[in-house]
Amino acid sequence: MTGAFAHGQSLLVADAHLQREGGQERKTVDVAVGILINAHNQFLLTSRPPGKVYEAYWEFPGGKLEANETVEQALTRELEEELGLKIDDVQIWRQQLVDYPHALVRLNFCKVRSWQGNLEMREGQQFAWQSLPVQVVPVLPGTVPVLTWLAEESGFVGDTHQASS
């Protein structure tokens, strides 16, 4: 479910039936998210690690910005920490505000087409190279808009993912 938000940015409300933690005074958490695209035009999805909110849901890798970090710096740090990859070029692409029950999150999506290193799942997560429609389930709500944008760019028609049951 989406709604209007300040400055023309849309708001995606995840699990709208659940109560929001922190009420109206919640701060927005900025997150850098990497859309790693390989030579076969597949993108990388990772499962959320054990013990985290939305455990085992599939998402694009990334993490929270630390104080005084740019999106590019945060993404570079997070992908090295979580996946063991050194990224070369970050293209800031799109932004989506997501109202999760546990947090209000501004997702800063970046395309990454060049990196060094081998994938290492350093937080106990799984990974899958995917194309549309994605075959992994369940997909994190904040990931769904990206799948739609990728479909629009590539001319893909049809469901981008399987709905969670």
Q: For the regions a protein language model found, what residue spans apply to each?
A:
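Conserved Nudix-box catalytic region and its N-terminal flanking loop in Nudix hydrolases
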Residues: 2, 42-81
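Generic C-terminal helix-cap and adjacent flexible tail
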Residues: 151-165
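Active-site-adjacent beta-strand/loop module that shapes the phosphate/pyrophosphate-binding cleft
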Residues: 38, 86, 95-119, 126
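Short secondary-structure junctions
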Residues: 82-89
